[in-house]
Regions:
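Charge-dense, helix-prone N-terminal extensions
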Residues: 1-122
Length: 122
């Protein structure tokens, strides 16, 4: 998935916002909660990072082309990073990105979710 495809897909998810941070990463949030990030190029952490359920983390963590996300997974959080498309194609990746968005949205307070739904999506 190219950076353009990644950004276009993430932008299509309701109430998602984009920032560039952490040394040039394309970072996507919903209600201020991170749901996906992409580091491009030759960075040691190059790849697409997304939040997963505990079960998905156990299933995906040792698959070729996937790994526990640096920093996030080392802190006990359930985040996966796709570094190549060996065992997860772009179509599957978009399903996980959508689920990551839903997981982040679910972590918002009721008031935060209401504020998002009562204001127009950016």
């Amino acid at each position: 998935m190219t950076p353009e495809q990644f950004n276009t897909f993430c932008a299509s998810l309701p109430h998602s916002t984009h920032v560039v941070q952490w040394g040039g990463a394309q970072v996507w949030k919903v209600g201020g909660k991170l749901f996906a990030a992409m580091w491009d190029g030759d960075a040691p952490n190059a790849g697409i990072t997304f939040k997963v359920t505990p079960l998905a983390f156990e299933l995906l963590r040792d698959q070729p082309g996937l790994r526990p996300a640096p920093y996030l997974a080392s802190r006990g959080m359930k985040w996966i990073q796709r570094v190549s498309a060996e065992s997860m194609n772009d179509e599957e990746l978009t399903l996980y990105l959508r689920q990551s968005h839903e997981l982040a949205l679910a972590r918002l307070t009721r008031a935060q979710r209401q504020a998002l739904t009562s204001s127009p999506a950016p």
